[in-house]
Amino acid sequence: MQRALPGARQHLGAILASASVVVKALCAVVLFLYLLSFAVDTGCLAVTPGYLFPPNFWIWTLATHGLMEQHVWDVAISLATVVVAGRLLEPLWGALELLIFFSVVNVSVGLLGALAYLLTYMASFNLVYLFTIRIHGALGFLGGVLVALKQTMGDCVVLRVPQVRVSVVPMLLLALLLLLRLATLLQSPALASYGFGLLSSWVYLRFYQRHSRGRGDMADHFAFATFFPEILQPVVGLLANLVHGLLVKVKICQKTVKRYDVGAPSSITISLPGTDPQDAERRRQLALKALNERLKRVEDQSAWPSMDDDEEEAGAKTDSPLPLEEASTPPGKVTVPESSLITLETAPLL
């Protein structure tokens, strides 16, 4: 153990040295608030449902609750989550987008958690749910990071025996936390934070995240139903589509838009905002393969032309005049057919 600690410290120092300012700042704030908890009561930094809403309105807790920890093992989880996000997500998104993602997930977890406990109080009239419950910690952001990893590298294998892929880790951890809660080994705010972190991060990445291809990610492998076992996916997908249709009617979400960019008669480019580049590349390869097979069949059928066909083609070439457009085109210039944009709205697979 004593031999492993220096190596772990050196490895952690190397990771933080190469990290961005955002990752370093988040780690520093987590450590500072944990050390501060030994000197003063930091409960005012956690989200307390009875104090978040009027008349108290502790709005600052939405920004601080995700960075406040009270145990050393929770601090380790927070630091590991931030470092993993910096190593795997920041190169894809950038430091600013990672900070936006962190803020969106933590604010959503605080609001949804406080609202859930407020509704629980209204059903039970138990003041514990208003003034004793404290929502804090990085479990909400951990859920968001796992959802983002499912989006970007869902096919990667985490465990080989038994084989576990990144795409199933979010729900596996949710099931584990649920079992710990049923065994009274885990407090309810931790389970609520992780669950709302999963939900809020998926909604943001699915519909609202801005990138070079538009907004959101409407890829089939990132649908809401894919978080569940295959036997439940049809039912979950149906319910998710009903909810999405309702949100579209109330103008909270927008319909999926497919854009067909027709650049020339020989090629058509189809772009769906938010689709995975790997899916697009795979479909393009399949389309090219089908096109090559069709061209090969056409060449085989026309391999032995008849003499009559040759004479007709020769007569057509000698009798037909040059096209007016080609004759009027100045040397060195090539006319390119104008492209048009066709926009279709389709219902997404949620």
From Swiss-Prot:
GO cellular component, one term: Golgi cisterna membrane
Membrane topology type: Multi-pass membrane protein
Key word Membrane present: yes
Region annotation (Mediates localization to the Golgi) ranges: 206-229
In-chain residues carrying the UniProt-annotated modification Phosphothreonine: T329
Entry-linked SUPFAM superfamilies: Rhomboid-like
Name used for this protein in its record: Transmembrane protein 115
Organism whose genome encodes this protein: Mus musculus
Organism placement in taxonomy: Eukaryota, Metazoa, Chordata, Craniata, Vertebrata
